[in-house]
Amino acid sequence: NCISTIDTVSSGHIYLENEDITEIKEENIAKFRRENLGFIFQDFNLLDTLTIEENIALILTINKVPEKEIDKKTLEIARKLGIEEILNKYPYQVSGGQKQRCASARAIVNNPKIILADEPTGSLDSKAARQLLEIMEDMNNKMKATILMVTHDPLSASYAKKILFLKDGKIFNKIEKGEKQRKDFYNEILDVLALLGG
């Protein structure tokens, strides 16, 4: 919550590209969030009165991106996530997995510096989950976006470069992927989970 600027820190500082985000003035926080952060929530937070396309494009519209560029970026991300066929539908007309892909598209359409993801694959089938994780991995590798993901799913975690395991509110263990293959890293995650007792 502190990184997202929803809560303020009681002590210390948080830096994003040498900018102390704890010092951002209240009137500039919304602009900071729009330009730097992408959020993928467990509950999709889609606007029911907007189409899927309008939900995805919302952040670009707020940021006054030219309409042609909005159309291009929205269609491009929708294709990557396999939801281009439902762009004209409303959230109540699509499945839970399609809503999650829409929410994910909205979070990443503006290439944020940080993506905060809370169980992003929770309501997706395995194919859609893999597509989303690969897109997030691509954003991390090619666009240098930092992704902070909370997950209980070892497969989702295996897409990360670094994992912190929490137990009773404290860091229990930390592992890094390094040069390991995903399968080997996945098995290492399972070993740590066994130590954690779940």
Report the location of each language-model feature.
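A short, proline-enriched helix->beta-strand linker immediately N-terminal to the Walker B motif
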Residues: 109-113
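Conserved ABC ATPase signature
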Residues: 90-94, 98-100
